[in-house]
Amino acid sequence: MPRILIADDEESMRVLVARAIALDGHEIVTAEDGAEALEILTDQDGAFDLLLTDIKMPIMDGIALALAAARDFPDVTILLMTGFADQRERASGLNAIVHDVVTKPFSVADIRTAVADALASKARE
């Protein structure tokens, strides 16, 4: 069963995404911001198949989290989420480390498909 770490400062979004992804039988761990997510990744020695993170968050944003995760845990696939066009542009330079950027708002089906695609690409590596 794939392990997925979700980082989003909006509780309602964390809950929605966690519930949607759990429908596919994944083990879910959540974090309120990038710093907490990085702490979880470090404490668990990167034992996740996928990091699904919002870009715009306080303390440590998703871009900084993605850079740290890719550096320290290169086997973890990274999927970003954002509702802001300027944040999506910031992420465009991270193609080497980020699987994709999912644009908010999205449907439950959209996020499940994005996660399935990211996990499938990891399996092909």
Name each model-derived stretch.
Residues 57:
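Receiver (REC) domain active-site loop signature in two-component systems and cognate sites
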Residues 15-23:
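Charged docking surfaces used in two-component/phosphorelay signaling
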Residues 30-50:
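Acidic, metal-coordinating helix/loop segments flanking the phosphotransfer/catalytic sites
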Residues 106-119, 123:
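C-terminal output helix
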Residues 33-36, 61-65:
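Acidic catalytic/metal-coordinating carboxylates
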Residues 64, 84-102, 109, 113:
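Alpha4 helix (beta4-alpha4-beta5 surface) of REC/receiver domains from two-component response regulators
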Residues 53-54:
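Active-site T/S-Asp motif of two-component receiver
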